[in-house]
């Protein structure tokens, strides 16, 4: 089973790089078993939240972790005998069967990706982080969306919004009718019942908060403060609010109620007309200002374009005013400029010659320096090439040793095919033995039937002859004794076969129990029981220490 254990170790190392490989599964500790099984279950079912490590100390926590992993394996479809003892007291046979099942249940996409990648290369921290991010995003995409106001505190923390930011801005023009219906007329009551918006509608149409608006209205009613007309106009222009409802006494008439409302309506209409007039005038002035600005821009561009030509014409007119004198001045200026140019050319040649010589020297020095640098680089590259060649030879030697010590994948595949061929051959041999056994059983049945018929026929003949002949009577007794002895022999042979079969079954069970390391498991169970007893004694001492002060008081 060494090759099977190596294959299992290789697959587990691909699942979780933190699992330290061992030579055989019998050397697996409970902590390694828990980490390997939890890693495989996490790959099979990413939604499962299983512990990755086995806690130390408290046995109750260890039993809980082992039981949860056993339940996860059962949910994944494992039909074998599994429980907390499989993880706390592992044996090689059951552990091998469990890990082979989990490796077969791994996703095919992951296995194909691993086959294409290098098996000896472990995942980097960046790849592990990307895998974790993909799992988190997949888990968040599977969760249903819940609005923020319907989330509990725990759910908010899970979904990344531990608090809600609400702007408590009041609606200062909130309209709340009085609680006494006798103070309102029939028309006002009808308006409030059918047309007036309620508190929720007044605050829902804007960014104002309901609680803040009600508190603000209560403060206004408490201190009997009224808003000015300018404030009301500002609020009306910012966000529309329902018209205020004036409360009147029951003894007022309908004409007195309508007069202030009509006056306010007329004032509002006049202000609206004035506002529209001012807006129209403002638009007309804005159009005129835009046209003037455009004309100003065009004029500035035209002036900028004409200004150089104007300066040129001014200079030309100044020169043409006294042409002979200006021509003489220009000739003198031209001669002085030529002599100055010749002088400057000579000075430049005197200054340029040493500079050219120094430039040639610098170029030569730079080329020599570059050649020296190239030679140094060549020497350095040769040294690196020698080092790389030596390292390549060392790695080749290591690869040869590794290939000699560890069988490659093809060798594993070849051995697996050999195992399968041997199993098929054994199965064919078993079928052949079963066929031979059936044929032999048929022959035995035929021979037994023939013997039974011959015995019955002989028994009848001897029985008829025994009535008249003494020798026939003695032969009949010997025949009966022979038949009884033959039956005893057949029973003895059957009992011998059953005993041999039971002996073989017991030998197989003994071999299986030897592989389970019963003695080691019993020692671990004894140690765990002692830890439980020690923990119980500590709890009893704590209870006594708590009860003694209470008894003294």
UniProtKB/Swiss-Prot annotation:
Domain of life assignment: Eukaryota
Pfam families registered for this protein in UniProt: CCDC22_CC (PF05667), CCDC22_N (PF21674)
Sections of the chain in a coiled coil: 261-286, 314-407, 498-549
Start and end residues of each stretch annotated as Disordered: 236-264
GO molecular function: cullin family protein binding
Keywords: Coiled coil
Residues of the signal peptide: none
A Gene Ontology BP annotation from the UniProt entry: positive regulation of ubiquitin-dependent protein catabolic process
Family membership: Belongs to the CCDC22 family.
PANTHER family listed in its UniProt record: COILED-COIL DOMAIN-CONTAINING PROTEIN 22 (PTHR15668:SF4), JM1 PROTEIN (PTHR15668)
Name used for this protein in its record: Coiled-coil domain-containing protein 22 homolog
UniProt source species: Drosophila erecta (Fruit fly)
